[in-house]
């Protein structure tokens, strides 16, 4: 590929994205969420219609109280200044467990109890205990399954993407997308190596990583990220920053990826040429870079496209799907993103939809602009994936200028 270096500092503050509804809501969540996540299941399981023996009620209530106090403490110690990995693992696991308990305590506490009442099953206490055991059973099954889903090597998701401006020489171009690997407190160096081995079986022309490599600095997570250096691609490996890089010394991650042989596309583009046709491969920093305070970091699409022939098709890497509004305005052909994790733990996807224009998969956002949003290759925080499986994506680009090859 031909390098056209056009790295520029971020555009002015007027271009910074407006604070979303989800971000405003997040300001209150640290105070409200822990109480709701632990108090609601406690009430449903132990105090609504049941008459458990007093020791059971006291022990159960104490256990929920311990979770309410312990989860925030562990999260602060794990993700605050101290960055204690063991505390982070405990806090993240408690967060995922409480979310699942809360979700199913609410759903089964209302729907199952209503169904049992309509069916006139037993007395009130009998119905309450059925609900309790149902919630505990469903939670245990989902935790076990969700943990296995999170720790497994992702399945490969394959799809053809038709780009009207793609030249015939580029038909069949194989683009592999990995994103949101989130190397973190749980050591996943072996998992990382297996992901890279899977990518190498796909015979990619281009491999893309659209950010959120890790939770932690490059120095701290280096051993987990090093396998990325083994990834093979016929025409190159490209990378853009995600929001989590800006929580953990983003420039260190840019430097490490460069050391591992990846091209950091920081507001610049490359030219991929094959069969006499050319595809512009552009990338921008994550939108959060604009408020990170790091000199030279910021999402700058104009800089990324500076010098590119406007008649050529453009493949854009941008971590967050929300960037697609800018991409559509600039006439981008295809944007690749991650960030959403597909919600990761159902039904969190409803909150994600408040913040992002797409959750997962291929979507249209302008007459010419397509967006592919990956559910992510790894997981963030809680080591669970429930009804939102991880993925390695193989996109085969198709041109309208000749029949689709088999």
Feature-to-residue mapping (PLM):
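Non-catalytic terminal accessory segments
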Residues: 1-152, 404
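Canonical alpha-helical transmembrane segment with a positive-inside/aromatic-interface signature
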Residues: 125-171, 175-177, 183-188
């Amino acid at each position: 590929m031909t390098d056209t270096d056009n790295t520029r500092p971020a555009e002015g503050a007027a271009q910074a994205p407006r604070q979303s509804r989800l971000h405003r809501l997040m300001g209150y969540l640290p105070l409200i969420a822990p109480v709701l996540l632990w108090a609601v299941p406690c009430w449903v399981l132990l105090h609504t219609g049941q008459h458990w023996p007093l020791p059971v009620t006291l022990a159960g209530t104490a256990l929920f109280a311990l979770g309410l106090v312990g989860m925030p403490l562990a999260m602060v110690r794990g993700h605050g200044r101290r960055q204690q990995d063991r505390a982070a693992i405990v806090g993240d696991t408690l967060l995922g467990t409480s979310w699942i308990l809360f979700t199913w305590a609410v759903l089964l506490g209302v729907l199952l109890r209503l169904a049992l009442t309509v069916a006139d099953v037993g007395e009130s206490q009998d119905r309450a205990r059925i609900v309790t055991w149902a919630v505990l059973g469903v939670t245990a099954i989902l935790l076990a399954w969700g943990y296995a889903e999170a720790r497994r090597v992702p399945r490969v998701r394959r799809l053809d993407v038709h780009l009207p401006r793609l030249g015939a020489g580029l038909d069949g171009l194989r683009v592999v997308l990995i994103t949101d690997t989130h190397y973190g407190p749980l050591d996943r160096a072996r998992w990382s190596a297996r992901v890279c081995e899977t990518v190498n079986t796909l015979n990619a022309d281009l491999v893309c990583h659209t950010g959120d490599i890790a939770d932690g600095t490059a120095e701290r997570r280096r051993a987990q990220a090093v396998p990325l250096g083994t990834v093979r691609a016929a025409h190159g490996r490209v990378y853009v920053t995600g929001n989590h890089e800006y929580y953990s010394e983003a420039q260190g991650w840019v430097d490490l990826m460069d050391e591992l042989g990846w091209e950091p596309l920081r507001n610049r583009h490359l030219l991929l040429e094959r069969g006499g046709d050319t595809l512009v491969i552009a990338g921008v920093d994550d939108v959060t870079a604009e408020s990170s305070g790091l000199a030279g970091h910021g999402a700058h699409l104009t800089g990324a496209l500076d010098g590119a022939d406007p008649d050529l098709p453009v493949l854009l890497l941008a971590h967050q799907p929300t960037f697609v509004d800018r991409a559509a305005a600039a006439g981008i052909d295809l944007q690749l993103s991650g960030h959403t994790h597909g919600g990761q733990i159902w039904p969190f996807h409803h909150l994600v939809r408040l913040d992002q224009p797409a959750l997962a998969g291929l979507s249209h956002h302008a007459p010419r602009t397509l967006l592919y949003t990956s559910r992510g290759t790894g997981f963030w925080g809680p080591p669970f994936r429930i009804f939102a499986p991880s993925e390695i994506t193989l996109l085969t680009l198709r041109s309208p200028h000749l029949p689709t090859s088999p």
